[in-house]
């Protein structure tokens, strides 16, 4: 037995309450190493009533198998250990490590030779409470400046014609009224949640350089325009999530300019990380977003005057400062009270966790069903314990999906291993709350990476809408928009329907409808069954079983299911078999969602 590979940690993603009535336990073991794992679990004060239950493999990655069991809780005080078996070899595994069964009195919760794992008490307030609507959410990300110009009177001076090749300086006039005017399009598409990149006053076209957190950018509209958007969206069953930038502000932020002018005498000097006074822009002597990229020696800023540099740099917030924190959380409370349904948080990794905990209390105190999503590009386990964010932008899965679907750089088996590794990092509530994406304002568009191959995009979308978490479509991907990395991925939405890929859009409509109507896709367990050149994923909720089968090769592939009748929910084709087996031929570069 490979004991070095075995791992468990209570009060973590390996042991967590799903609810007050359900408690999930996971165990990691070497891949293919164990024959059997039994969980011995019960009330730590009534240990004689303990139960022995077999654990099943929830998933496998490249190196490990992950066993799990959902325990129906009858008392919030939980004790447990594992019985591990391989051939004739047996070990007990508990908080004190490994022990031979014959040397332990298992009738005792604790003995000198062996100590059980404990989850001391399931406190309701500690349970990760995701919003009630995340499992059925179908998101659509909008970059407001490039979505629709609904009121040309709001546009900046010298606005570029709609559809101009984008760069980091030009404006095209997108605004909040434009989004409101296109809600019917979004409703028809199947969207029920919007994520808007920043809309607060800023100097750039992307608005991540906020200069006033309490005011809508005047080129986007005003508070009445936001209220109208929220109200009209809610009438259509569409929720609205705003983007909050609390890691840094714009260089033109009034309080930062006060520090530039008055130095150490400024009452706002501790709102930012100033290394020395007076403030200098060349060289930069304060912490800013990304530090180097927005320093004056960056090629994109080398010709700017000092006055321009003052606004181009994005100073980092000191969120430990009580007054700075009060200002930011006051703005958060204002917009949350206005009726938004949650927040996406920019550069979330670099902001202290104390701030995020107060942020969550502020938001949930106003709207207990609000969603909180962080921008993370790597493992975010520490932030997803239910006291900070609900989920994150799932760039780990996004990268894997691009490698498999767009590039064919990994095999189906390796792809499912990466997916399992990502899923096992987090609790079920966190996985359900992940914002899953194929592209965004910070990446090249999928169709560009795939060389314009829409069949690859359709495959990736079929995966996205049937995987665990909240599927999110970047504006225009559904009609075939392309673009390299920023700024090219931020083109204006082309509203000329004759330019759309209508077949692709219809595919997205079908997937969105299925996601919103099929409970197995919302709440079902996930199991990967890839074989050969086929990626296979099962979602099951009670008797409802849906199987996503994707052929990402240029050759037809056969897939066999048990049963004599199978229907593809995408093409609506039926397949008949015999002797309790149905063989389905999956054409090259195509996807099926099969139902028995």
Where do the PLM segments sit?
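Aromatic/acidic polysaccharide-binding cleft in carbohydrate-active enzymes
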Residues: 145, 386-390, 432-455, 459-500
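Glycan-association/targeting regions that enable binding to alpha-glucans and other polysaccharides
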Residues: 1-135
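Hydrophobic faces of well-ordered beta-strands that scaffold small-molecule active sites
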Residues: 138-140, 194-196, 240-242, 343, ...
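Substrate-binding/active-site clefts of carbohydrate-active enzymes
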Residues: 139, 143-192, 199-337, 359, ...
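Active-site-proximal helices and loops of the catalytic beta/alpha 8
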Residues: 230-238, 247-248, 253-264, 331-333, ...
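C-terminal beta-strand-rich structural cap/linker in extracellular carbohydrate-active enzymes
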Residues: 31, 578-596
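Conserved, mostly hydrophobic/aromatic
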Residues: 27, 142, 186, 196, ...
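Carbohydrate-binding surface patches
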Residues: 14, 24-26, 528-562
